């Protein structure tokens, strides 16, 4: 993988990232330091545009301001209500959108990301968000990132989180340009989510209160394990495994 500089002032960060990634055999991709951010570009499909993490502006910021607050399905799924601010581990962080929504609603969220490239994009997005005068204070307090394989990192947690959130990669039917672009980039970057079914037993072993699995509406249960309940949205479903109910 190439690391490119459009902003010479970012040379120290580029050198540090090159050292961190080592020999990553992804010749069709480049990580590009622009003046504004770190971007991932697919060199053989330039029309796909850049993939990057932005918590300050764009769709994520719009959702934070106008997305329905605690009335959102994801908030109900993790059990967020007055007086209850669950500690959440998002074991399949991706570009961090769902983790950011939960943090914006008051949850402390630890993100786990298996891909070193995606983790670098996330780290860059977190660093920029931390400097923002509006969201920076709570981003620094509520969001942290761990890079590593999801199952091993989950099983190695020293404290049991209230909620473990899973959104394993699944082939999308939706034709939205954003989903198509990101899914194509992600699938060629990290490959299929081969350990997706193994995530659920690990999460059930480590969560204190519940495990939430986000699925496309047409997908079956993860690991063919029936949830305690499901919360359905227009195109997705949150399968919720309530630990107290499972224990009973």
Curated annotation (Swiss-Prot):
The lineage of its organism: Bacteria, Pseudomonadati, Pseudomonadota, Gammaproteobacteria, Aeromonadales. One of its GO terms (molecular function) is rRNA (guanine-N2-)-methyltransferase activity. InterPro entries: 16SrRNA_methylTrfase_J (IPR007536), SAM-dependent_MTases_sf (IPR029063). Coiled coil: none annotated. It catalyses: guanosine(1516) in 16S rRNA + S-adenosyl-L-methionine = N(2)-methylguanosine(1516) in 16S rRNA + S-adenosyl-L-homocysteine + H(+). It comes from Aeromonas hydrophila subsp. hydrophila (strain ATCC 7966 / DSM 30187 / BCRC 13018 / CCUG 14551 / JCM 1027 / KCTC 2358 / NCIMB 9240 / NCTC 8049). Its EC number is 2.1.1.242. It comes from the Bacteria. This is Ribosomal RNA small subunit methyltransferase J. SUPFAM superfamilies: S-adenosyl-L-methionine-dependent methyltransferases.
């Amino acid at each position: 993988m190439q690391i490119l500089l459009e902003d010479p002032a970012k040379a120290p960060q580029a050198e540090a990232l090159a050292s961190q990634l080592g020999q990553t055999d992804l010749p069709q991709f480049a990580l590009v330091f622009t003046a504004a951010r770190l971007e991932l570009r697919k060199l053989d499909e330039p029309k796909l545009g850049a993939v990057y993490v932005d918590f300050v502006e764009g769709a994520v910021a719009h959702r934070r301001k106008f997305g329905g607050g605690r009335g959102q399905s994801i908030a109900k799924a993790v059990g967020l209500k007055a007086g209850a601010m669950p500690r959440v581990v998002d074991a399949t962080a991706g570009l961090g959108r769902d983790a950011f929504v939960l943090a914006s609603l008051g949850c402390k969220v630890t993100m786990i990301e298996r891909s070193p490239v995606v983790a670098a994009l996330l780290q860059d997005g977190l660093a920029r968000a931390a400097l923002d005068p509006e969201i920076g204070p709570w981003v620094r307090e509520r969001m942290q990132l761990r890079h590593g394989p999801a199952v091993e990192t989950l099983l190695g947690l020293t404290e049991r989180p209230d909620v473990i959130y899973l959104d394993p990669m699944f082939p999308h039917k939706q034709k939205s340009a954003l989903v198509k672009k990101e899914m194509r980039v992600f699938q060629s970057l990290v490959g299929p989510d081969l350990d997706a079914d193994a995530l659920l037993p690990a999460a059930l072993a480590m969560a204190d209160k519940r495990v939430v699995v986000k699925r496309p509406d047409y997908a079956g249960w993860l690991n063919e394990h029936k949830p305690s309940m499901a919360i359905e949205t227009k195109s997705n479903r949150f399968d919720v495994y309530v630990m107290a109910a499972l224990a009973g």
